[in-house]
Swiss-Prot record:
Swiss-Prot/TrEMBL catalytic activity: shikimate + NADP(+) = 3-dehydroshikimate + NADPH + H(+)
Entries under InterPro entries matching the protein: Aminoacid_DH-like_N_sf, NAD(P)-bd_dom_sf, SDH_C, Shikimate_DH, Shikimate_DH-bd_N, Shikimate_DH_fam
Subunit and interaction comment: Homodimer.
Organism: Streptococcus uberis (strain ATCC BAA-854 / 0140J)
Protein name as it appears in the record: Shikimate dehydrogenase (NADP(+))
Residues binding shikimate: S22, L23, S24, S69, N94, D111, Y238
UniProt keyword Nucleotide-binding present: no
Enzyme class (EC, first level): oxidoreductase
GO molecular function terms listed in the Swiss-Prot or TrEMBL record: NADP binding; shikimate 3-dehydrogenase (NADP+) activity
One Pfam family of this chain: SDH_C
Amino acid sequence: MSERLSGHTLLISLIATPIRHSLSPKMHNEAFAKLGLDYAYLAFEVGNEELADAVQGIRALGIRGSNVSMPNKQAIIPYLDEISPAAELVGAVNTVVNKDGKGHLVGHVTDGTGAVRALAEEGVDIKDQIITLSGAGGAGTAIAVQLGLDGAKEVRIFNQKDAAFANAEKTVEKINSRTQTKASLTDLADQEAFKKSIAESSIYIDATGVGMKPLEDMSLITDPEVIRPDLVVFDVVYSPAETKLLKFAKEHGAKKAINGLGMMLYQGAEAFKLFTGEDMPVDYIKDLLFNDQDK
């Protein structure tokens, strides 16, 4: 990559914490190199406390765009000049574009489309399905909304009663009023309702981040009876490649156990297009990422 850097190189960033596990820098930098684009992608350890300064830095330094991950996807919105209609519906942002590098920051969301495409690539069609989703943060909200837009029969959201719960109530209202999908929200502490919902669902999606460091020894599902041969289990975490949830699902005979690598790839491809105006070489990047994960 050093051979590509020059005084004209445009910088793209990632602001999140924790950050060291992220494959986004590799994905984007390899794509830039493959296409001969004079861009570089760097990750910065940024939480909510540093977020305002980080956004000001994007403006001041002329950084052309940034991906945004936990815990900043909702917190960043007040610092932006504009958000896309999809981001407004979701109430979260995972991609920021600095229009012409002049400091006008526009927020977008690509998580939901990335997740649905990742499922489709695994042969899983969400249309007319009952889906249980745990987690109502930025990623979970984006997925829930996209499931509604793409025709799921029901989306049953479970989340602990934290700051995200009130936002999830608004998300449920939006899905019910703007799509044909029936959405509901339940406290994750109600384990009987949680298990019953999964028993009635064909797809279970965990968007909580449980299973990623430092919670790699945890899983929201610990009862083998919850796992069925016709149940698809999808965890948005991709590092580790096999979370405790996915290992448990495989051991107890789930139809499919899918990690978040595909979601990361496809949401990244959409962000890449927003940053550069070019199509990411998805097949090339997919081979690189999946081969690395298999080592």
